[in-house]
């Protein structure tokens, strides 16, 4: 599974960018999942008066609405993005909004000031409204996904290539192996290697074992 984030201020073209990328990746034969991060405290899919809301109010911690055309699983809490990704098995998962995931990102903006405020080392390209005004922003390409989505998809494939190869990582807590999706395995592997590769005794390809007693 490969993960890419599309982030930026509201009304700068995030959703348009995401939908165009979805269409192009599907055209290329990939399966695609998405996660929409919503920074609005009052947001809730469920609402007072519904039967599922009554279930939650009665104390149910997980409620499922099983309909003819869709199934909605409702949890009364915000989940960590790594936990959310465990539910996905698609080739690509696109995160709309800054969920805090450690993955390549596309930054949208309407102005260069927008870009400067949200720029991070994760960003591999710029898109959104500003793509009608610029070709490059510093070292980064600016791509209009309404006109050049193929170029953006090529870049995404290249930037997420390492995620495709599942890292050989095993995590145990009190002797119990903890299941992790490939994205989380690769993230954990990169963090550990980044921390120890400057130490004496480190050799690329060698097994690394860490034990932490909490």
At which residue positions do the language-model features occur?
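Conserved lysine of the Walker
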Residues: 14
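Walker A (P-loop) phosphate-binding loop of P-loop NTPases
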Residues: 11
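N-terminal phosphate/diphosphate-binding loop that engages ATP/GTP or pyrophosphate donors
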Residues: 20-79
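C-terminal accessory "lid"/substrate-recognition subdomains
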Residues: 27, 73, 91, 126-214
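The Walker A (P-loop) glycine that initiates the GxxxxGKT/S ATP-binding motif of P-loop NTPases
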Residues: 8
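Conserved C-terminal guanine-recognition region of P-loop GTPase G domains, centered on the G4
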Residues: 95-134
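Phosphate-binding/switch loop-helix module in NTP-utilizing enzymes
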Residues: 74-101
């Amino acid at each position: 599974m490969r993960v890419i984030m599309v982030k930026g201020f509201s009304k700068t073209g995030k959703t348009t960018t995401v939908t165009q990328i979805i269409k192009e990746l599907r055209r290329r034969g990939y399966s695609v999942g998405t996660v929409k991060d919503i920074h609005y405290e009052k947001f809730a899919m469920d609402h007072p008066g519904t039967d599922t809301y009554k279930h939650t109010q009665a104390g149910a911690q997980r409620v499922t609405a099983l309909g003819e055309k869709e199934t909605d699983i409702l949890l009364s809490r915000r989940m960590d993005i790594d936990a959310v990704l465990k539910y996905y098995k698609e080739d690509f998962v696109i995160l709309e909004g800054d969920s805090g995931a450690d993955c390549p990102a596309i930054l949208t903006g309407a102005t260069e000031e927008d870009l400067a405020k949200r720029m991070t080392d994760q960003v591999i390209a710029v898109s959104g409204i500003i793509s009608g005004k610029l070709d490059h922003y510093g070292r980064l390409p600016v791509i209009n996904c309404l006109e050049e989505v193929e170029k953006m998809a090529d870049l995404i494939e290249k930037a997420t290539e390492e995620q495709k190869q599942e890292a050989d990582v095993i995590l145990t807590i009190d002797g119990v192996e903890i299941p992790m999706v490939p994205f989380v395995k690769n993230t954990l592997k990169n963090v550990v290697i980044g921390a120890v590769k400057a130490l004496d005794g480190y050799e690329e390809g060698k097994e690394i074992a860490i034990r932490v007693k909490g």
